[in-house]
From Swiss-Prot:
Cellular compartment(s): Cytoplasm
Name of the protein in question: Peptide chain release factor 3
Tagged with keyword Ribosomal protein: no
One GO CC term on file: cytosol
Annotated function: Increases the formation of ribosomal termination complexes and stimulates activities of RF-1 and RF-2. It binds guanine nucleotides and has strong preference for UGA stop codons. It may interact directly with the ribosome. The stimulation of RF-1 and RF-2 is significantly reduced by GTP and GDP, but not by GMP.
Domain tr-type G: 8-268
Cited HAMAP family: Rel_fac_3
Source organism (scientific name): Streptococcus thermophilus (strain ATCC BAA-250 / LMG 18311)
Length: 514
């Protein structure tokens, strides 16, 4: 098969949702259909046969939340599917937003009893900004939920996206009978031995069933007043196809997967800082690092840089240019993933996600290219932290482990590090409290370095240019610090302290982000 055909087989997407909407469950069901797991909840290593959950980090297993982005790959129906599972917890939005830069489509999982929730709305805004297609799965029909028409209306009113139902529920909760599949023109049955039935048999199958009568009325209303199906609008991110089902009971999931793969886009191009778009079919390899993850295998204390291949083909052992440094690097030890399981990879093409073993060479946002044409992809989103903690090693004899742990976890982008200009103290910045808890847990469990963390509360952060720096600017209302790139930054007590500083030093430009 030609490289062009291989690229056209790729379907790379992320699953987004509010916590507890069923994202992990539907991910596992998709892996089940891809032959990667024997049953939902257990992920099978391709070679070892060992079981592992898609949530691989200890704290994820303990707390039932996703705090890192997993990458999973499988073949299904002639397609190579790359799923990027994303953190659902709001404190990890920064990692999630970067992950959404590496996909061509998004699957939005919604709890049919709760509708659009806060985190779903936030993540949808990022997807909408990128203009990529969104496919919606209304989950948990095995439980009582809101009226389907209300859910569609909420998509349009809250998210501002038109919707088209691909199927429609017949009852829900204990009265759930199945789905009226509008796209495939059939009935999908929840009970009994037969999975599908013809639509014309519906009146016989559901004779005197008020829920089936309601379904027919809803569909008639949608036919007259609903949106028209348009593949063009779907690919433009203007229309979301809506699928109903139950991930927990694995009902409607395979129908969703089959239909999703018909309409999900092939790998798309990616823009450079100069505004050019790199075509996936360009023969020269290029890619960008969207995530760095330390200790995916605690036995080896390794670190992986996740790279989205934008164009061309990766071949093991190839040399690439690292645009940020202008230096070359050899990609010899490269893997692909199935949650905890990983395999060395010889070849991969545009649309694939590869993991490059990293000894400190790479940073999040790095561009990799080959050939004479050196360029840089547009930067990944960054977020200014609001919460701060002082951090130090509990045991002075563990300083080496402490510094190694901080260096690696900061390079992941999971937390931000600042150093007090006057005292040299380390300060951590985060978007949310949970990031601190995960940092502490990982320092103790992965680096054997207990830490002392002292809350500093909320701060307003502003960067200044190095040439404007004067240490006399530091006062009781601010802290002068350096970020991890040695750029000067002020941590202000509050907005009043920020305004006071701006009035006192009108010639100093304060930047919200560097």
């Amino acid at each position: 098969m030609s490289i062009r055909d291989e690229i056209k087989k790729r379907r790379t997407f992320a699953i987004i949702s509010h916590p507890d909407a069923g994202k992990t469950t539907i991910t596992e069901q998709l892996l089940y259909f891809g032959g990667e797991i024997r049953e939902a909840g257990t992920v099978k290593g391709k070679k070892t046969g060992n079981f592992a959950k898609s949530d691989w980090m200890d704290i994820e297993k303990q707390r039932g939340i996703s705090v890192t982005s997993s990458v999973m790959q499988f073949d299904y129906a002639g397609k190579r599917v790359n799923i990027l599972d994303t953190p659902g917890h709001e404190d990890f939005s920064e990692d999630t937003y970067r992950t959404l830069m590496a996909v061509d489509a998004a699957v939005m999982v919604v709890d049919s009893a709760k509708g659009i929730e806060a985190q779903t709305k936030k993540l949808f805004e990022v997807v909408k900004h990128r203009g990529i297609p969104v496919f919606t799965f209304m989950n948990k029909l095995d439980r009582d939920g809101r009226e389907p028409l209300d859910l569609l209306e909420e998509l349009e009113e809250v998210l501002g996206i038109a919707s088209y139902p691909m199927n429609w529920p017949i009852g829900m909760g204990k009265a759930f009978e199945g789905l009226y599949d509008l796209y495939n023109e059939r009935l999908e049955l929840y009970k009994g031995n037969e999975r599908f039935a013809k639509i014309e048999d519906g009146d016989t199958l559901f004779a005197n069933n008020p829920f089936y009568e309601q379904t027919k009325e809803d569909i008639e209303l949608l036919t007259e007043a609903g949106n028209e199906f348009s593949e063009e609008a779907i690919l433009a991110g203007e229309l979301t196809p809506v699928f109903f089902g139950s991930a927990l009971t694995n009902f409607g999931v395979q129908t969703f997967l089959d239909t999703f793969l018909k309409f999900a886009p092939e790998p798309h191009g990616h823009k450079t800082v100069d505004g050019d778009e790199i075509d996936p079919l360009n023969k020269d390899f290029s890619g960008f690092v969207f995530k760095i993850q330390a200790n995916m295998d605690p036995r080896h204390r390794d670190r992986i840089a996740f790279v989205r291949i934008v164009s061309g083909e990766f071949e093991r052992g190839m040399s690439v240019n690292l645009t940020r440094t202008g230096k070359g690097a050899k990609l010899s030890n490269v893997t692909q993933f199935m949650a905890e399981s990983r395999e060395n990879v010889e070849n991969a093409v545009a649309g694939d996600i590869i993991g490059v073993y990293d000894t400190g060479t790479y940073q999040v946002g790095d561009t990799l290219t080959v050939g004479k044409n050196k360029f840089e992809f547009e930067p990944l989103p960054t977020f200014t932290p609001e919460l701060f903690m002082k951090v130090s090693a509990k045991n002075v004899m563990k300083q080496k482990s402490f510094h190694k742990g901080i260096e690696q976890l900061v390079q992941e982008g999971a937390i931000q590090l600042y150093t007090n200009y006057q005292t040299g103290e380390y300060m951590l910045g985060a978007v949310g409290q949970l990031q601190f808890e995960v940092f502490k847990h990982r320092m103790e469990n992965e680096y054997n370095a207990e830490v002392v963390m002292t809350p500093m509360g909320k701060k307003t952060v502003r960067w200044i240019q190095p040439e404007d720096l004067d240490e006399r600017m530091s006062s009781s209302r601010n802290i002068l610090a350096k970020d991890r790139f040695d750029q000067p930054v002020f941590l202000f007590e509050n907005d009043f302290a920020l305004r006071w500083f701006a009035d006192k030093y009108p010639d100093v430009t304060l930047e919200e982000k560097m």
